[in-house]
Amino acid sequence: HVTIENGRSFFKALQEDRPIILITGHFGNFEIGGFLLGLLGYPTFSVARKLDNPYLDRFVSDFRGRTGQFIIDKNTGYEDVVSVMEKRGIMAFLADQSAGKKGAWVKFFGRPASAYKAMALMSLQYDAPIFVCYATRRDNKPLNFTMRMVEALDPRALPPEIKTVQQI
């Protein structure tokens, strides 16, 4: 059982002819969002590195793919990401990882952190709204989750003072 909170603008965006960017972090059950959307008929695509164990990598990829959640290889998948965006698909990212020296430096809990620029750039280039979400188990019961859409950013509605990738 999954309850979706604050999802009205997200489900409205699914009906538009635009790609969507989902952002979450390594918090709660970050896998349930892609699983749920795939079951509802909205396949999601995520960028990740291959697992070190090729047998486990194949098992996890096959399992995700059966429910409509597909992994694009972080090292070789640029064209695949472009294709998803051009076909108005859903890209999902775990955005709580350091982008290293080339990232956009932002404040995170008052401390400087290096964030990936790609999500903001793709949002602007492909007119894709960004939705920040997370899922947690509810009432400490198995297979009982709440998925929360916490924030939404639509590039069509950016205020004029937003001018940089860091601000997005």
Model region roles, listed by residue range:
Residues H1-G89:
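Conserved nucleotide-cofactor-binding alpha/beta core module
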